Design a protein with these regions (language model features):
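PDZ/PDZ-like domain segments forming the peptide/carboxylate-binding groove
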Residues: 104-164, 245-246, 321, 368-369
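C-terminal, active-site-flanking charged/polar segments
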Residues: 1-19, 335-338, 354-365, 369-374, ...
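Hydrophobic alpha-helical and helix-loop surface patches within well-folded domains
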Residues: 9-10, 57-58, 71, 126, ...
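In a subset of proteins, long, contiguous C-terminal domains/tails are tracked
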Residues: 261-263, 292, 372-436
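Cleft-lining beta-strand/loop regions that shape enzyme active-site pockets
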Residues: 27, 42-46, 131-141, 155, ...
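Sequence signature of WD/YWTD-type beta-propeller architectures
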Residues: 1-93, 224, 383
């Protein structure tokens, strides 16, 4: 077909759907959506009897509130409350025909800035380098040629001077992902007048970030690695599992392969958002060190390849959930090592999120439950209790302390003292002498 035949007309047969106007009676639409979400749970919940919940009675109880709904958000509240009667995790409702809220994307510099009242300027207190080789996952101030250091001063954003009243943040509103000129001066300069500052200042142009979560996450992980290495004199490794999906499996291999030869490994599963790759990670951790492949040229390699020879400890907290729950309870069942921290979230009935309501809302039906030999059905709605419970208080957060990691290192050092990991000591190589 050529372009002329695609024009909207009776001759072409193409209809311009954008000209169609539809009048929606929201009360009737919301009633239908409520009924549909109820029906989807009835048809797809993982047990036919919905774990004994009188689902017809639940519908009658909440349907009486439909005439009193006055907004789309109130419908969401009603669906959430109804699905909550199942007492089951992963029964969600999200999306739908909501009005678009105004957005004010702030351009991020991947740095902490503080105002210095003596120098009357903003100071780059901390610059988060992140992963310099990943686009949008490092501070733009760490780019080659920018040459901004911690302690340097920020004088202006986009040509507008900053002070205690005009902050960098407000000048970066609507500048996310944009090239923004910054006026900076070296931090080791003594207090000078405005004219002298202006003369010695220089202008740089950086492309701001849309957010700093990944940049700051990398800094947190690196600091934890350094802490563990320092406290154990390099004998113990550390890695973090942010989820059980693509990010999590990538982070696992990034940390695991670099530290697999240590005498111990701390696997931090705090804030693990779940996913589906826990069996792959458990398979790696469960492989035991059986021997070495010893070549003439090169270094000996563990057999099986990339297997641990030392102790394992997992850290978990109340934000470790879903496949994170399954990982921690399986770690215990396999007797790979102790669990340190807090009881996990407790939600292990899986979903696929394939069904949508008429306005695009997605509701999820808990369809895939799991039973463990050692725990039965008990992980759902309870979680996994740690072997060593440690409180993480607000006071610790304010002091920038990590009591869970500190207690884990303490436990690892105890294990290394009581059950030392033997260094490699080969027996003499066999002799193959010719017979006399």
């Amino acid at each position: 077909e050529n372009k002329a035949e695609k024009h909207f007309s009776r001759k072409s047969g193409w209809l311009d759907l954008s000209r169609i106007r539809i009048s929606v009676q929201y009360q009737k639409e919301w009633a239908q959506m409520f009924q549909e979400s109820w029906r989807l749970q009835k048809e797809f919940f993982w047990t036919e009897d919905l774990s004994g919940v009188d689902w017809e009675r639940v519908y009658q109880r909440y349907a009486r509130l439909l005439p009193r709904i006055g907004s789309r958000s109130e419908l969401s509240d009603l669906i959430w409350e109804m699905q909550g009667e199942l007492g089951t995790s992963h029964a969600y409702e999200y999306g739908g025909d909501y009005p678009h809220a105004p957005r004010y994307p702030v351009g991020c510099l991947g740095a902490d800035l503080v105002f210095d009242s003596k120098r009357r300027s903003w100071i780059f207190q901390k610059i988060y380098s992140g992963d310099i080789w990943k686009t949008n996952e490092h501070s733009p101030l760490a780019e080659p040629g920018v040459a901004v250091k911690e302690g340097d001063q920020l004088l202006a954003v986009g040509g507008v001077p900053v002070d205690e009243h005009k902050t960098p943040g407000e000048l970066l509103v609507h500048q996310a992902g944009q090239f923004v000129p910054l006026t900076v001066i070296e931090g080791n300069q003594k207090k000078k007048g405005a004219k002298r500052k202006a003369k010695e200042a220089r202008q740089i142009v950086v492309k701001t970030l849309f957010g700093e979560q990944k940049v700051r996450y990398r800094e947190w992980v690196r600091n934890n690695v350094k802490t563990v290495e320092s406290l154990t004199e390099g004998r113990v490794g550390y890695l973090h599992l942010p989820d059980m999906s693509t990010h999590g499996i990538a982070e696992f291999h990034r940390g695991y392969l670099a530290q697999v030869d240590r005498e111990g490994l701390i696997v931090d599963a705090r804030y693990n958002a779940g996913g589906m790759v826990s069996p792959l990670i458990l398979e790696k951790l469960a492989h035991r060190h059986l021997g070495y492949d010893v070549p003439r040229w090169g270094s000996p390699e563990s057999y099986p390849y990339h297997t641990l020879r030392g102790h394992l400890i997992v850290i978990a907290n109340q934000f470790t959930g879903s496949d994170g729950d399954m990982f921690t309870t399986s770690f215990r069942q396999l007797q790979l090592g102790p669990l340190v921290g807090k009881r996990t979230w407790g939600g292990v009935i899986g979903i696929d999120g394939r069904y949508q309501l008429v306005d695009g809302t997605t509701t999820t039906q808990p369809q895939y439950s799991i039973w463990f030999h050692h725990a039965g059905w008990s992980v759902e709605n309870h979680g996994v209790d740690p072997d060593i419970e440690v409180e993480d208080t607000p006071q610790s957060f304010i002091k920038n302390e990590d009591p869970l990691l500190a207690r884990t290192v303490q436990e690892m050092l105890r294990l290394l003292k009581e059950k030392p990991v033997q260094s490699v000591s080969y027996s003499p190589s066999p002799r193959r002498l010719l017979p006399e």
